[in-house]
């Protein structure tokens, strides 16, 4: 019964991976693809929680969503600061961040 939801979650996960592979030059699209991967993984945890009738996957999902929100906000803040300094957020211009 839950296999349809699992197929949707796996397709979302693959869509996120495909977004990272195809858009290597755009940071915002890569960040959105990483968020999609994390949300698909948490959706899989929730489906597994419904199948096995345990709560540990739900707790883990809340932790994954918290880390995803923190990662997204920090990543966007770094991108905004970088855009203010350089005027672009293309990956080709990120070589000055090496330290």
UniProtKB/Swiss-Prot annotation:
Main location: mitochondrion
Cited Gene3D superfamilies: 1.10.287.3510
Catalytic activity of the protein: a ubiquinone + NADH + 5 H(+)(in) = a ubiquinol + NAD(+) + 4 H(+)(out)
Enzyme class: translocase
Locations listed in the record: Mitochondrion membrane
One Gene Ontology cellular component: mitochondrial membrane
Signal peptide residue numbers: none
EC number assigned by the record: 7.1.1.2
InterPro entries: NADH_UbQ_OxRdtase_chain4L/K (IPR001133), NUOK/Mnh_C1-like (IPR039428)
Superkingdom in the source lineage: Eukaryota
Keyword terms of this UniProt record: Electron transport, Membrane, Mitochondrion, NAD, Respiratory chain, Translocase, Transmembrane, Transmembrane helix, Transport, Ubiquinone
Transmembrane feature ranges: 2-22, 27-47, 59-79
One annotated GO molecular function: NADH dehydrogenase (ubiquinone) activity
Any one Gene Ontology BP term: ATP synthesis coupled electron transport
Pfam family, one: Oxidored_q2
Membrane topology: Multi-pass membrane protein
The family this protein is said to belong to: Belongs to the complex I subunit 4L family.
Reported function: Core subunit of the mitochondrial membrane respiratory chain NADH dehydrogenase (Complex I) that is believed to belong to the minimal assembly required for catalysis. Complex I functions in the transfer of electrons from NADH to the respiratory chain. The immediate electron acceptor for the enzyme is believed to be ubiquinone.
Name of the protein described by the UniProt record: NADH-ubiquinone oxidoreductase chain 4L
Protein source organism: Metridium senile (Brown sea anemone)
């Amino acid at each position: 019964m839950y296999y349809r939801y699992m197929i949707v979650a796996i397709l979302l996960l693959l869509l996120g991976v495909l977004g990272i592979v195809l858009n290597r030059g755009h940071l915002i699209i890569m960040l959105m693809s990483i968020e999609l991967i994390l949300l698909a993984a948490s959706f899989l945890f929730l489906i597994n929680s419904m199948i096995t009738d345990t709560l540990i996957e739900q707790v883990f999902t809340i932790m994954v969503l918290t880390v995803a929100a923190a990662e997204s906000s920090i990543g966007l803040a770094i991108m905004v600061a970088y855009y203010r300094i350089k005027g672009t957020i293309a990956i080709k211009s990120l070589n000055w961040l090496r330290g």
